[in-house]
């Protein structure tokens, strides 16, 4: 695929598939390594002991099943198997076996953490993984092309809706419209409160920054009308998510959302084809 910014272009399906497989594997791999690193906190004496969390499950049979699954040695084995499946995704591509295992194991991990360990990144991880699952099962019952089309559109609709809703919610909140919310959030960042002379303590600058985010998020669906717009949108989104990582330490937030970008660019290209 050659890029000519003066002419509309499309992202080929094989390239979009390969990019998403590799980006998702990187994203989920980082998450899995984090879980392995946190094993001491998940044992019986740890902060996230299963003995406490199991009380959220009322069904005795389900409790017994998860007691076995979330035993330290078994859960560790599950995480290593998850890394192996992600490696196979990079080396051999998506197939019914590795994607289904990754989806089911991801649900188990979410149950272990009461639904979401890291908020939005877990949501987007599940969205991309669900898209991959759709691609394989639709491909199994129908055909591969239809499966990947359904995958990309599912991920894109979920992603664009998330951006738009986030912007719309900010638009309705007075603290975002007047810029104070940005200062409040940054004061709670990992680098500590903004110092007294920091530029973002100036009301006009924090208001400008807030409105920039609001307008960008609300305009997200417009990126689908041209592949070039989609690429620019994804570049801006990558910068935004990197800043979230930089200020708040949410590293998996960056990779989880970047993994959805190939689907967005691909879908924009399909709209270009339909419009031509």
Regions of interest found by a model, annotated:
Residues 1-276:
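Alpha-helical membrane-anchoring segments
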């Amino acid at each position: 695929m050659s890029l000519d910014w003066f002419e509309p272009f499309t992202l080929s399906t094989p390239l979009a598939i390969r990019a998403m497989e590799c980006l998702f594997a990187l994203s989920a791999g980082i998450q899995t390594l984090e879980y392995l690193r946190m094993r001491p906190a998940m044992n019986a004496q740890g902060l996230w002991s299963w003995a406490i969390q199991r009380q959220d499950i009322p069904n005795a049979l389900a409790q017994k099943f998860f007691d076995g699954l979330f035993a330290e040695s078994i859960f560790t084995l599950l995480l290593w198997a998850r890394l192996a499946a992600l490696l196979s995704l990079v080396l051999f591509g998506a197939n019914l076996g590795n994607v289904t295992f990754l989806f089911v194991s991801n649900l188990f991990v979410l149950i272990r953490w009461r639904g979401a360990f890291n908020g939005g990144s877990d949501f987007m991880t599940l969205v991309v993984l669900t898209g991959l699952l759709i691609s394989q099962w639709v491909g199994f019952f129908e055909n591969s092309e239809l499966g990947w089309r359904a995958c990309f559109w599912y991920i894109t609709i979920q992603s664009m809706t998330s951006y738009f809703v986030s912007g719309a919610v900010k638009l309705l909140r007075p603290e975002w419209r007047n810029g104070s919310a940005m200062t409040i959030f940054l004061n709670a960042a990992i680098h500590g409160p903004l110092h007294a002379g920091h530029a973002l303590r100036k009301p006009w600058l924090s208001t400008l920054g807030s409105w920039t985010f609001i307008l960008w998020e609300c305009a997200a669906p417009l990126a689908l009308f041209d592949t070039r717009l989609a690429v620019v949108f994804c570049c801006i989104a990558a910068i935004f998510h990197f800043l979230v990582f930089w200020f708040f330490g949410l590293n998996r937030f960056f990779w989880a959302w970047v993994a959805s970008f190939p689907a967005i660019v691909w879908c924009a290209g399909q709209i270009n084809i339909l419009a031509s």
